[in-house]
Amino acid sequence: MHVATLGLGANLGDRLRSLQSAVDLLAAEGVRAVASSRVWETDPVGGPPDQPPYLNAVILTETHAGPHEVLAACNRVEAELGRTREIRWGSRTIDIDVLLYDELIVNEPELTIPHPRMTERSFVVLPLLELDPDPILADGTRILDLAVDAEGARPYAPPLVLP
């Protein structure tokens, strides 16, 4: 059994429902959430101006799938929930990122683990710290040693319901 850490985000439609639906659909894909952070509301980072705020959460999942299969499952769930990829860092109904997968380091065009920008984003780091108070990446980086700007991030809802 493998552990994949996923970041979830949504800023269009019923944002909270989209996050919960993603958890439920991922379980049907064999990527079952075993822990969830609280849901955080965060200001958009990058992308077009005047985007609505995001809801974000981090989930720990267990799966028999490999990292590429987990990414494929995330992409299928995004498509099922209406995700379109028209504008880089634009608004979206759902975004699911593979942040970590066991202690694996992957550096390929279609998949990079650890996620290359996860340590720069409060909407990833703050929820991740709820699940692991002192996470250490496969390359030895301690997240607590990094300066992350928490401005614009605020708790919004309790953890997502696990399947």
Residue ranges, per PLM feature:
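Flexible, gly/pro- and Lys/Arg-enriched active-site loops
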Residues: G30, A35, V39, V45-Y54, ...
